Amino acid sequence: MAAVILESIFLKRSQQKKKTSPLNFKKRLFLLTVHKLSYYEYDFERGRRGSKKGSIDVEKITCVETVIPEKNPPPERQIPRRGEESSEMEQISIIERFPYPFQVVYDEGPLYVFSPTEELRKRWIHQLKNVIRYNSDLVQKYHPCFWIDGQYLCCSQTAKNAMGCQILENRNGSLKPGSSHRKTKKPLPPTPEEDQILKKPLPPEPTAAPISTTELKKVVALYDYMPMNANDLQLRKGEEYFILEESNLPWWRARDKNGQEGYIPSNYITEAEDSIEMYEWYSKHMTRSQAEQLLKQEGKEGGFIVRDSSKAGKYTVSVFAKSTGEPQGVIRHYVVCSTPQSQYYLAEKHLFSTIPELINYHQHNSAGLISRLKYPVSKQNKNAPSTAGLGYGSWEIDPKDLTFLKELGTGQFGVVKYGKWRGQYDVAIKMIREGSMSEDEFIEEAKVMMNLSHEKLVQLYGVCTKQRPIFIITEYMANGCLLNYLREMRHRFQTQQLLEMCKDVCEAMEYLESKQFLHRDLAARNCLVNDQGVVKVSDFGLSRYVLDDEYTSSVGSKFPVRWSPPEVLMYSKFSSKSDIWAFGVLMWEIYSLGKMPYERFTNSETAEHIAQGLRLYRPHLASERVYTIMYSCWHEKADERPSFKILLSNILDVMDEES
């Protein structure tokens, strides 16, 4: 699969290849490679690409140019507001929402595409001209206006493939003089009819005013980011940037204070206005027990942490004090409250408009707290999160950029090795054994999987598909497989740490659930642990591409019977609820420190017992509350099992109660 050069959501006008075809406009996800310009349906709620709707071979493109927008189009060429019926609402011209059209001309006529911004249009035209520059049939004249109602608005010619009416001034392609890649074509002299057309004055092409920075969203970099390819923009922690393009995808286009533009990872930034993420005292994903452990280790009077509360949308201030007479010190947790007027307080008499103002006040005044907030405490190294790919658009990875350092083990698809990308970035390299995977299907789906980005998912970086075996490149996790981690470290875990592992996995699965993406093989063996003990979910969705019948058949020796609900064992019916069942078994694995589920039974006996209603017993490290959560995942009726969102809420409640 060729690397994607550009990827954007545009409005596409129907090409009306038949005279009876309707004129309509649809949002499409456009992808450009060196070989094809393709467009797809796009699911905005799930943030993923849909079915392919069409493509154009790059070698067939003869011209790429802007189009002069039609002024005051009639109602039939206008579109309704999103979500409203056109017969019941004010019509809005298409150019008001996607005001920057351009055309891609090929052997079947012009394809009209509408961009939401002038900058995005310019970039696409530039890249398209770059990839077609060696084409042999580039035209010397084009139509600057739309083809509408059977004719071009600029010259009234009625043949869709009629020669253009305006001469291109060496703008179509970018060949240097004397290039041997294609013969230079001199334009033919105009016919008398064309000469008359050319003498007609054309309507002036509108000039787009540069985007004012006051109209753009301002963000602050949370981490440094060094560009990995030419499309990227460098980030410096604490500096401000302006967002030029924002999407559901994990890369946004931005501009720095010097006017440099490029793509940045969206998980490396936060909104500049009233954001608390940039402050040293804030730890977004820290739990109550982690905060207590860190404050005790620091042992400083007035040490404090501001963290997300277990209650959605709330914050908690955790404070350590020695002055209470307790030899080990005392930790108090204060929920940041708010009034109906959006004023924040810890003590009701002291109200503030923002949380930073609140913290600043209590850094100088205890005002009812166990101690004033003297020392912000945080993890020594707040590691930057993984990016979705090694730079924007970097999908196909060059094997020459990989250095293999050591073998990590052997998985379902082959050997896994630890290595470096370009000598500096840690990666895991899965070398796919030939015949073990449906490779073509995986490669098509992996582009979607790369856009799944969450801090508790092992990030897919890219693939190497131009040789065999193919490689899958992912985030490296230093402590390896969760199952082995549990077995090897079994005497060192406190129950609170085990619950945090469950929370980590549940957060990842809630994210996949929100994207309507199934894992299909959730188990401790398919989760990995990083150097800080954070658990991340791996191999999501890969089981669909296994070619081994012993793995894919429910009666096969390798099928994950012990993690499968009745509807999967009997009917191979996978759903988010079958992932819920598997999560309950994974919780059991964690609290049993890596034991085999149903260890006394064979696979066939296990399947029989599950069908009869047998469920796993409560591990001795699991409290009744924890066991209630895992047991709720094993309801015989799939619809009666909770969602991952509910499970996460229940786990957070237990974390607060048992800490």
Swiss-Prot record:
Residues 171-210 are annotated as: Disordered. Residues 12-24 are annotated as: Inositol-(1,3,4,5)-tetrakisphosphate 1-binding. Pfam families: BTK, PH, PK_Tyr_Ser-Thr, SH2, SH3_1. It comes from the Eukaryota. 1D-myo-inositol 1,3,4,5-tetrakisphosphate binds at K26, R28, Y39, K53. Zn(2+) binds at H143, C154, C155, C165. Its cofactor is Zn(2+). One of its GO terms (biological process) is positive regulation of NLRP3 inflammasome complex assembly. The active site is at D521 (proton acceptor). Residues 214-274 form the SH3 domain. This is Tyrosine-protein kinase BTK. It comes from Mus musculus.
